[in-house]
Amino acid sequence: MRQSKHALKLVGLLAVLGGPAMAQEQANAPGAKTGTTFRFEGKVGAEYNSNVAVSDLDTNTGEGDWAATINALAEATFVPVEKLTFRAGYDFSQSLHQEFDAFDLAIHRGYGEAAYDFDLVTVGVLGNLAQANLDGDEYLTLTQVQPYLSKQFGNSLFLRAAYSATEKEFEGRPQRDATADAVQLDGYVFLDGVQRYVVLGGRATEEDATAAEFDYSSWLARARFVQRFDAFDQNLTFRAGVEYEDRDYDNVTPLIGTPRSDKRTVADAQIDIPLGEQFFSEISYRYGRFESNLASADYDEHVGAVKLGVKY
């Protein structure tokens, strides 16, 4: 059980830091006015996972469980002069399982960003510091620095290219400590402004761990569709996406006597429903298929969730 609960933290942290998320979409929104703005969002909910799994430490329970979830985000944006933007925030998430309480995961993340629009291109840097605690124990600290370039092309295309340097420190598991270098490119194709758009992206990663068996290289491709529409006198938002990662390990994995090879496919869908001006609900579903020549890392999962939230 000890090995299982450690892995779940890593999965949560990588989900927080990886990929184009709504926070990044807002961070890159053009046309910010001078001054300071604040944003807060809180959510509570419940989710069911058909297979409580720990993909990044290669184990799964084969059993499902319910969990209560809590999320909170506080963010401040400061635009001292036109074209210069500073942003800082704190993000917290917590899961509380019904049966597998040893898998209760808390993630704390602080982040800061600075960007300047040079007209030809926007230059920025984003920093993340995250800590994961599982069942009350500190497990993983992750730091990341991500310089980036972005450019808006008219009203139909937005591109963002970035390099990420990441360092992982595992409490009590120094053989898994690692540094990673990644390059990524994301494109936002606006079909009807922000009412309907597509996000296409890719990332290549090289990770070097203390123990050679955990070194790997990977490439990832993703696509996401967002549609806002009116129904029941409300403006609803539908999101759907798919992500595929091919990961090849550089050295022999002792358990199988050969280098590992993983293929991971994740598809998800979500609908956001306003409940007045400040309140909202989210209904989501995610399917994950994890293929590997290491038997304990070969499985699939279904995750459904319902959340209620407030934002200011």
Question: Whereabouts are the PLM-identified features?
Answer:
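Cleavable N-terminal export/targeting peptides
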Residues: 1-35
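Gram-negative and organellar
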Residues: 23-312
